[in-house]
């Protein structure tokens, strides 16, 4: 994911009511911060990294149960390209329903220099293989 412009970042700021000038005021960011330029809102970076993990990790999820840890490791700037990688840590069967389990994963977000910018762990409830429905792409229609 490439942060091409400030627009998406500023829109996210406004939608989430995060009006901190570090994200929205170029003069402030240049003059009054150690970064010298606007920083992309960390929760936007987290949301994008989470979104990148959905097709592989939780595309068939029944529910996201918990975010155990969320760490913003380094700032992300407009023009940065973000990549994501997820590792499965553990899986356990549900104690209440035999058709599902809980998968624990950790996801890393990296910038174009390979620097870690975001890290989180989460638990996802997923159907067991024998109960999972075939996944379809959202743009596939039954009509063909």
Where are these regions (language model features)?
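Hot-dog-fold acyl-thioester-processing enzymes
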Residues: 1-66, 118, 128-144
């Amino acid at each position: 994911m490439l942060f091409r412009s400030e627009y998406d970042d500023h829109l996210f700021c406004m939608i989430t009511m995060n009006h901190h000038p570090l994200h929205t005021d170029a003069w402030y960011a240049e003059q009054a911060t150690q970064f010298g330029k606007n920083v992309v809102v960390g929760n936007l970076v987290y949301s994008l990294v989470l979104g990148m993990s959905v097709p592989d990790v939780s595309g068939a999820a029944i529910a996201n149960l918990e975010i155990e840890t969320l760490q913003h490791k380094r700032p992300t700037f407009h023009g940065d390209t973000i990549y994501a990688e997820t590792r499965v840590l553990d899986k356990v069967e549900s104690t209440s329903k035999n058709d599902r389990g809980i998968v624990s994963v950790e996801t890393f977000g990296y910038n174009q220099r390979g620097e870690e910018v975001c890290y989180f762990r989460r638990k996802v409830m997923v159907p067991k293989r024998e109960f999972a429905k075939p996944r379809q792409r959202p743009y596939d229609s039954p009509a063909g």
